[in-house]
Amino acid sequence: TVWFNAVLRGDVHFIKIGNRVNIQDGSCLHTLYGKAPIIIGDDVTVGHNVTLHGCEVKSGALIGMGSTILDHAVVGHGAIVAAGALVLKNTVIGDGELWGGVPARFIKKVDPEQAKELNVGYAQHYVMYSDWYRRSDAHPNTHITAPHRKNMTKLPNGNTSTREIMRKF
């Protein structure tokens, strides 16, 4: 899903987006003229106000709010880029690694099960949000009733909240 005010500029190279990807509000994806497309794998969350520029984000990754990933950078499978991070050009973030800061640096390896639970969980939540939003009883600029908790999509561990997962970090 591509949310409000997100911009995908594939004007000078292509953008390829996998399944169950959510690109949240205000994010900007732009390619590098003739040199660097944007490639995003499956089950990826791109947080609010993220800038992706000519980079690759592999399946199961989570890109935190307000972060920037520059040309030719690669974010590995199940990796996490912390909110507000600046990933410099040509940086390679390994599978299952947590990076953060300005400029972004390696922080730690994340347990693969925890990363999958968190990253895929967020992706699944946004699939649910898009289904809910498209329903006939949800309309913009009117009173919208949120889905009842009992009807929410379950995370892989059976939880309906990511709070428990975040406590593990």
Question: Where are the regions that the model predicts?
Answer:
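Glycine-rich hexapeptide-repeat left-handed beta-helix
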Residues: 11, 17-19, 25-40, 48-166
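Short proline/glycine- and basic residue-enriched helix-capping loop/turn segments at helix->loop/beta transitions
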Residues: 45
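N-terminal first-folded block
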Residues: 1, 5-9, 35
